[in-house]
Amino acid sequence: MKLIDIHAVAIIPAKTDSTRLKKKNLRVVAGKTLVEHAIDYAKASKLVQDIIVTSESDEVRDIVETYDNVLFYERDKSYMGEREVADVYVNIFQKQFRDKGEWRIPQMATHVVGIQPDHPDRTNKLDDMIEYFIKNKYDDLVTVDSYGTRNGSVRIVKAEMVKHGTMSRRVG
């Protein structure tokens, strides 16, 4: 696959009902909320064509509405709590796109890039990671910390795996 053929969709899950730290994705770090850091990270990519923020929060919706070309999808309550984030991605592709009549995105998507807002200190450029993913012909890639422990800051998956619900649920 050539880079010109890439249509990456960034999905930023930004729930505010975290059990350990309430509204953590709305916390301000270096003058911006964690949600804003995640959106800006996605917007800096030349390979990401669509950005979707999903949340149950009107506060998150208000932040998203200040950005051009960023979609807000209200997260279904059954996808809250300690649900695997992979289930959120699959739900967006299998249900929410259909319900919103957004057929263009899932039809065009080649890759899904999950960006967790609670990691604002990313040092790798998103495009470099996507290019690495493609060059090495991976199906699924998740970031790790300096000790090699998965941190889920960014996860890249072939869109077909998300569309069909075949992506691993226990990564990232």
Q: Where do the model's predicted regions map?
A:
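N-terminal nucleotide-binding beta1-loop-alpha1 segment
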Residues: 1-22
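Short phosphate-binding loop-to-helix
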Residues: 52, 58-113, 121-122, 128
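Local beta-strand N-terminus motif with an aromatic residue
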Residues: 6-8, 48, 108-109, 138
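Hydrophobic targeting segments
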Residues: 7-12, 35, 50-53
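Short glycine-enriched, charge-decorated loop/helix-capping segments at active-site entrances
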Residues: 24-29, 78-79
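Conserved core of the sugar-phosphate nucleotidyltransferase
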Residues: 107-111, 116-172
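A short, N-terminal amphipathic alpha-helix
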Residues: 34-50, 62
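Short, hydrophobic beta-strand segments that form beta-sheet elements in well-ordered domains
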Residues: 51-55, 140-143
